[in-house]
């Protein structure tokens, strides 16, 4: 979730809901806020404007019912090429007439990190008071800054303690620590290299205005056509703006709409449906009684040409069907109202989680783990997974190398042993065989057959 606002000023005191903080601690001590519609809705309630809510817009082509204005959050990079294109385009539509500027609420952002509040005020304080109840704080600010220059209006916003306290009460603890770490002397988002910034788009006197507290003048995008709504003109401007901004594939932006509180419209519709339900139910009861009475009178009264009954506009069956439809509509709207109330409650739960400081809990928890002797093991298991994986990989590679070396050694040893054995067999085959000594110890003589053959030869000679 993007955080709006750039640099910081001097350290701010505890914001909360305490409106008695010293002015010296509020003027330059505004904190960064997230671009969350729930946060903005609760911030409007803290300003005293209870009939408004903020919704995030995901589809530009989807119609939005009765918006007061739009808030556009985009990435602010002064040196970016796309940024220069936007500046060159918008320089032609600056409104420099002092009388025209003083007739609208346009305030320059002179307090760092206050662009979220500036964007909301640019929408609310340019709306018709007959359609919107601003509350005491905003009504007083609007009356007090009437006719002021844009710079003085920005100073008036920064010097309003109710606004500063409400703004800072929705900041995360990290924003306060960042403010304390940087301190004064750091440039605001007007001069930072990269930050996220809010601007407002509102209809004023039949023309679409873009109000940016970091610009010297408001921007007039002109009138919309007679047959279209001002939101159609806004869609065309945003489509062109996003086409320029995303030229370098930078799509980090979001869009929010400031709309009437949906619960008010749902409650009004429920009241109307219940009134119609009571009317239809009463009419149905009267019709049923009239039918019963008519049947009894018909039985008692003689038929004459002068006794004519007016035909009813609705039959009992028609009224029963209408009553059933009303019951269904009431159930649907009651569910919508319950969903909106649950959503508003979740905004408060998320705000409590966002602004709560978990530092003490985390420190105490880690201290208890250290006393129990399990902190080191948890760190080695969860915080150093890459080292463990790399160590296991090295061990696996070493085991594979050892296995390969062992298999190579075994194969070479087997080959050496086989060669020696074959050489020994060859030597044994080349050596003459020694006669075997018999068991009785006597050397073997000639075979009896040879001796007999020799004797026969001698006898023949004689």
Curated annotation (Swiss-Prot):
Keyword list, A-Z: Chromatin regulator, Hydrolase, Nucleus, Protease, Thiol protease, Ubl conjugation pathway
InterPro entries, sorted: Papain-like_cys_pep_sf, Peptidase_C12_UCH, Peptidase_C12_UCH_sf, UCH_C
Enzyme Commission number(s) of this protein: 3.4.19.12
List of catalytic residues: 115 (nucleophile), 197 (proton donor)
GO CC annotation, single: chromatin
Site positions (Transition state stabilizer): 109
Highest taxon above the source species: Eukaryota
PROSITE patterns: UCH_DOMAIN (PS52048), ULD (PS52049)
Domain UCH catalytic: residue ranges: 29-260
Any single biological process term in GO: protein deubiquitination
Principal cellular location given in the protein's record: nucleus
Site feature Important for enzyme activity, where: 212
UniProt GO molecular function: chromatin binding; cysteine-type deubiquitinase activity
Chain spans, region Positively charged C-terminal tail required for binding nucleosomes: 387-462
The protein's role, per its UniProt record: Catalytic component of the polycomb repressive deubiquitinase (PR-DUB) complex, a complex that specifically mediates deubiquitination of histone H2A monoubiquitinated at 'Lys-119' (H2AK118ub1). Mediates bisymmetric organization of the PR-DUB complex and is involved in association with nucleosomes to mediate deubiquitination. Does not deubiquitinate monoubiquitinated histone H2B. Required to maintain the transcriptionally repressive state of homeotic genes throughout development. The PR-DUB complex has weak or no activity toward 'Lys-48'- and 'Lys-63'-linked polyubiquitin chains.
Protein name from the UniProt record: Ubiquitin carboxyl-terminal hydrolase calypso
Organism of origin: Drosophila virilis
């Amino acid at each position: 979730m993007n955080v709006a606002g750039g640099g910081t000023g001097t350290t701010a005191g505890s914001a909360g809901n305490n409106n008695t903080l010293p002015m010296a601690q509020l003027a330059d001590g505004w904190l960064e806020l997230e671009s969350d519609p729930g946060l903005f809705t609760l911030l409007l309630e803290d300003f005293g404007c209870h009939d408004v809510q903020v919704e995030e817009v995901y589809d530009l082509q989807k119609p939005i019912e009765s918006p007061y204005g739009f808030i556009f959050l985009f990435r602010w990079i002064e040196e970016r090429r796309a940024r220069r294109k936007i500046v060159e385009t918008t320089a032609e539509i600056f409104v420099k007439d002092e009388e025209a500027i003083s007739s609208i609420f346009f305030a320059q952002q002179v307090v760092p990190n206050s662009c979220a509040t500036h964007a909301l005020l640019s929408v609310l304080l340019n709306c018709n008071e007959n359609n919107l109840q601003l509350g005491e704080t905003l009504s007083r600010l609007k009356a007090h800054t009437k006719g002021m220059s844009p710079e003085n209006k920005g100073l008036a916003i920064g010097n309003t303690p109710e606004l500063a306290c409400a703004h800072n009460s929705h900041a995360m603890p990290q924003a306060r620590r960042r403010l304390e770490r940087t301190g004064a002397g750091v440039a605001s988002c007007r001069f930072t290299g990269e930050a996220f910034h809010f601007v407002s788009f509102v209809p004023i006197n039949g023309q679409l205005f873009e109000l940016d507290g970091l610009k010297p003048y408001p921007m007039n995008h002109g009138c919309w056509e007679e047959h279209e709504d001002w939101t159609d003109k806004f869609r065309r401007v945003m489509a062109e703006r996003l086409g320029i901004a995303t030229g370098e594939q930078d799509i980090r932006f979001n869009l929010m709409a400031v709309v009437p509180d949906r619960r008010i419209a749902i409650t009004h519709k429920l009241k109307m449906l219940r009134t119609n339900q009571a009317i239809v139910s009463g009419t149905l009861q009267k019709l049923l009684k009239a039918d019963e009475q008519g049947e009894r009178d018909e039985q008692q009264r003689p038929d004459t040409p002068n006794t004519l009954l007016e035909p009813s506009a609705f039959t009992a069956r028609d009224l029963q069907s209408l009553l059933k439809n009303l019951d269904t509509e009431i159930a649907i709207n009651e569910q919508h109202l319950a969903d909106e109330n649950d959503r508003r409650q979740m905004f408060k739960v998320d705000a409590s989680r966002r602004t709560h400081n978990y530092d003490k809990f985390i420190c105490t928890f880690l201290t208890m783990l250290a006393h129990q002797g399990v902190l080191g093991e948890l760190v080695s298991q969860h915080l150093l997974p890459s080292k463990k994986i790399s160590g296991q990989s090295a061990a696996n590679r070493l085991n594979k190398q050892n296995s390969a070396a062992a298999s190579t050694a075994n194969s070479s040893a087997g080959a050496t042993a086989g060669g020696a054995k074959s050489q020994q067999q060859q030597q044994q085959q080349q050596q003459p065989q020694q006669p075997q000594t018999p068991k009785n110890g006597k050397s073997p003589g000639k075979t009896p057959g040879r001796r007999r053959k020799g004797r026969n030869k001698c006898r023949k000679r004689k």
